[in-house]
Amino acid sequence: MTARASATTATTAAKPASAPSEAAQTDGQTDGHTKAQAEADALLHRLDAAKNSWATTTAAERVALLRAVKVAIMPVAEDWAATASQKKQIPAGSPLEGEEWLSGPYALLSACNNFIATLEAMDGRSLAATLPRRRLRNGQTAVSVVPHTLWDRLLLSGIRAEVWMQPGLDSTAIDERSAQAYATPASEREGRVALVLGAGNIAAIPLLDTLQKLLVENQVVLLKLNPVNDYLLPFFEAAFKPLIDQDFLAVIPGDAALGAWACEHDLVAEIHVTGAGSTHDAIVWGTGARRATAQGRDAPEQPPDYLRARRCLPHYRRAGAMERRRHPISG
């Protein structure tokens, strides 16, 4: 890296006239952002045109698409895991390569299998009735979700996971409220366009977030990758080709500026964030001095109608009563 930096410096010193000016660099960046925005805008319009078509697909049609996604994953899975290992400087043949398989192709395949099993087994909305439950000391109901299959028991030995219900929700209410996205007849559903701002730590997280929006919430998705995962774009596009081909999903790379632009797009009805609190705050409150001013006035800058946040949810709640008044969080 030092040698490369020295060579660059030497070249610049030898040909000062050819070095781009600050204005030229800015213009180049602006042109790049403008092109990226134009491409993203075109994709958002295609998603918007297809949103109701997706919302009205039946469970059987979604199962067929998920099976097609599984088939599409297989030819790229090995290169996907190998490329991720190389980027993280994991030696070829190292046991650590297994982590890239588990947090990449396997995670997506497993999610597809679980959604397929759920959609095929769902009778109305009664699937939750088959899951083990227990009552906590405080009276809340906990539903066991992992392990659920034989593969869970083999690969996740000793790991258990439960969903703890809100206080006051008994078993009857749980059965009635499960699979809400499928409660409305397919012909009566209305679609929405969701922006998923992909996390950067685990490659599979944005993929699973995307399936959440598509299959659980009936929303088509523009997935913007975290820049650290831009190199995985070809693999994600190949794996999700059955959904991308029908304009139910689009995947784009891009920096924070493109993400900020997409957050303000008129066609984006919902934003899904999995990441740092700083990302959340930049979306809701703005940046720099504007953030301090907006937070001081308890008035966010042009907030989206809905913001779904995971790890940054506590930051959202600290804003005060404002979010209950203007920014309902579903789920």
Question: How would you describe each model-predicted region?
Answer:
Residues 2-3, 27, 50-66, 187-190, ...:
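Conserved C-terminal structural/oligomerization subdomain of aldehyde/semialdehyde dehydrogenase
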Residues 2-178, 225-227, 239-244:
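N-terminal Rossmann-like NAD(P)+-binding subdomain of aldehyde/semialdehyde dehydrogenases
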Residues 161-204, 208, 215-217:
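Active-site-adjacent "gating/activation" loops or surface patches in catalytic cores
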Residues 205-257:
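PLP-dependent aminotransferase-like
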